[in-house]
């Protein structure tokens, strides 16, 4: 197994720096998930059908490159470690691709628009993969202490919630301010700013973190063997299913949210007010993961409870709107975000622990490969959610920058509340069966330190 070069404790500056990594990730990917679809349809002038097809096609692309990148990170050997160098190299390239993706050319032909969209989006996804997979895997390489990992992921989630809050609050006004009367220019200038933040945050994460868990060279293994090992890792498979559902609910709703406020509520500026109301609950909810985990001693069950409560609150939002009941609407939005933030912290805290379980179960350790499939699962969920939304809006007559028909309005409303609410409850049911608790995990780590494993006894 990997040997830890210290007592498992991680310096505070490293936890903060790791959190800044997810700040950077959100200034790229949350900007993309919340704004790229409406940018394509309402600014670039691309059809809903083309956007829907892109979302599905890009997941086939992910199915190829995610496992490859994950495997390559595990095989990387430098004086800076396995995973940190990827942040240094891939982050600036991805920042450039982010800017290119938000560079609209509305006067081009439809064919030229679609070709440009496909090329820039697929390259952006690849660039983000080259940053996000090693970044996510890095947590497990920083320590094997389950409580320290919980603290690291809490730092990650709190930082992410702050970043998401800032993005949601300032993006719409920034687009308007920087673009003056041109949304095209506004999106481009915002992408330049966010791209610089993305790169800077990952440089800081690279500089202030350290890989403490040293993986022996002999543990290089083929993709076929790694896939077989993954299929024997039951906690990981449950987490993977949870990530697919998570991607569907989060990104499908995020893609809908600006449409919802623009066309259902009638004013895109409500999105800024909504974002201001959820930022504090987001931060508090993320910080509440640790006390709930200490009570339950099971990260999967902790995620399950947060998911269930998120779903219930989101279902309740269907019955309220900004115009008629603003207090109830915004209060429920804050409650929903509080529970979601707790879930977001828990679901990512699960993954590193599954690596040790897999090593104990099969004798193989493959941190990057496992995180690659988590990333792929999340993106598959995202693809289904966004592609389905785009397909339904296109089928029922969505017309950009015009008043929408009742069917389109109904789709936007349900995509904002009832559909993700139901899926959160399904997610809660799946993760309830996660049984790798703190006691069992610590026993597994001790076995591994002594050279024992389930595979040795088989």
Kindly give the residue locations of the regions a language model identified.
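Membrane-embedded alpha-helical bundles of multi-pass transporters/translocases
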Residues: 2-458
């Amino acid at each position: 197994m990997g040997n830890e070069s210290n007592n498992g404790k991680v310096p505070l500056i490293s936890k903060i720096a790791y959190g800044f990594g997810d700040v950077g990730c959100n200034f790229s990917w949350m900007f993309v998930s919340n704004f790229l679809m409406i940018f394509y349809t309402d600014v670039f002038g691309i059809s809903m059908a083309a956007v829907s097809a892109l979302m599905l096609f890009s997941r086939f692309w992910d199915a190829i490159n995610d496992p490859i990148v994950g495997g390559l990170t595990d095989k990387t050997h430098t004086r800076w470690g396995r995973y940190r160098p990827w942040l240094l190299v891939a982050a600036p390239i991805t920042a450039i691709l982010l800017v290119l993706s938000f560079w609209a050319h509305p006067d081009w032909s439809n064919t030229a628009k679609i070709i440009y969209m496909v090329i820039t989006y697929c390259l952006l996804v690849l660039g983000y993969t080259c940053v996000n997979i090693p970044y996510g895997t890095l947590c497990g390489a920083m320590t094997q202490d389950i409580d320290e990992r919980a603290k690291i992921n809490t730092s990650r989630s709190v930082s992410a919630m702050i970043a998401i809050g800032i993005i949601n609050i300032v993006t719409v006004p920034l687009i308007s301010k920087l673009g003056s009367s041109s949304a095209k220019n506004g999106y481009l200038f915002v992408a330049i700013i966010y791209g610089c933040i993305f790169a800077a945050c990952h440089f800081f994460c690279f500089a202030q973190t350290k890989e403490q868990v040293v993986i022996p060279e002999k543990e290089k293994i083929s993709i076929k063997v790694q896939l077989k090992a993954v299929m024997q890792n039951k906690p990981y498979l449950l987490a993977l299913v949870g990530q697919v559902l998570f991607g569907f609910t989060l990104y499908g709703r995020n893609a809908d949210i600006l449409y919802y406020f623009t066309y259902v509520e009638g004013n895109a500026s409500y999105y800024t007010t909504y974002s201001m109301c959820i930022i504090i609950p987001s931060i508090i909810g993320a910080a509440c993961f640790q006390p709930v985990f200490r009570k339950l001693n099971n990260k999967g069950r902790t995620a399950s409870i947060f998911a269930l409560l998120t779903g219930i609150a989101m279902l309740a939002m269907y019955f309220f709107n900004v115009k008629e009941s603003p207090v109830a609407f915004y209060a429920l939005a804050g409650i929903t975000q509080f529970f979601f933030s707790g879930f977001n912290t828990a679901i990512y805290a699960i993954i590193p622990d599954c690596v040790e379980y897999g090593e104990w179960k099969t004798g193989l350790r493959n941190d990057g490969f496992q995180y690659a499939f988590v990333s792929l699962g999340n993106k598959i969920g995202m693809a289904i959610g966004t592609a389905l939304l785009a397909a339904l809006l296109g089928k029922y007559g969505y017309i950009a920058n015009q008043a929408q028909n009742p069917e389109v309005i109904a789709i936007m409303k349900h995509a904002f509340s009832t559909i993700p609410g139901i899926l959160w409850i399904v997610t809660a049911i799946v993760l309830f069966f996660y049984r790798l608790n703190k006691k069992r995990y610590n026993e597994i780590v001790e076995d591994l330190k002594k050279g024992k494993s389930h595979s040795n006894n088989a």
